Amino acid sequence: MIVLQTIAVAFAMFSAVPVPQFVWDEKNMRYALCAFPLVGLLCGALWCVCGVLPLPAPARAAGFCLVPVWVTGGIHLDGYADTCDALASYGDREKKLEILKDPHCGAFAVIRLCSYFAAYLCLAACVQFTPRVGALWTLALILERALSGLAVAAFPMAKNTGLAHTFASAADRTAVRNVLAVLAVLLCAALLALGGGALAAVAILLFLWYHHVAVQQLGGITGDLAGWFLQKTELWMLAPLCACQWGGLL
């Protein structure tokens, strides 16, 4: 029962998938971050369904672009937009954290979101779906969430409130770190075995950059910054996927 509730907590928080209502407590939140990658598995499965449907190329590209948004309800995009506004302000740490709390959408958020979807749609249109490509992308979507959850359990927090702090405080951080670190290594190995080593390399490099930006700019991570990392990693992994196909490596 606790296992199912733990999975339900992860899907309730990190997706738009309807789940039964129940009280969140210490027991069912302790390992919720370990279940976070399952949302990536669902995104990947639906992405593959979109790939095999007899759709016109533009509709398929739009599906590739929108499936993760529909599954997650845009929660990570919201963090991406807020973080783009904060980082583009070039203010001090307190100013950036204040911008992250502002519910309004600034000009830089709009510009970056438009640029993000333009780039994503363009790359998605270049993807030639095959079972191998579907498997690679599913692994990539799981990996980015494993790394995101690992960061929440391992990186310092920028503040003592908010989504990231709530899940970090409720988690058995040592166990979560160990589980997600092992999962990330296994996913990278699987990507490498399927010819997607470039995707794994991009994810790891962005994970290290994420830590640098979080510590240098904000003093730690926030829920918004976690969303920024996930969206950025997703877009940047799609680029080498396309490049490997163009180069005949997939």
Predicted regions, residues:
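C-terminal ends of transmembrane helices
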Residues: 18-23, 75, 95, 149-159, ...
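Alpha-helical membrane-inserting segments
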Residues: 46-54, 67, 71, 123-127, ...
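Membrane-proximal soluble regions of multi-pass membrane proteins
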Residues: 1-24
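Acidic (Asp/Glu-rich) catalytic motifs at the cytosolic membrane interface
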Residues: 67-105, 212-233
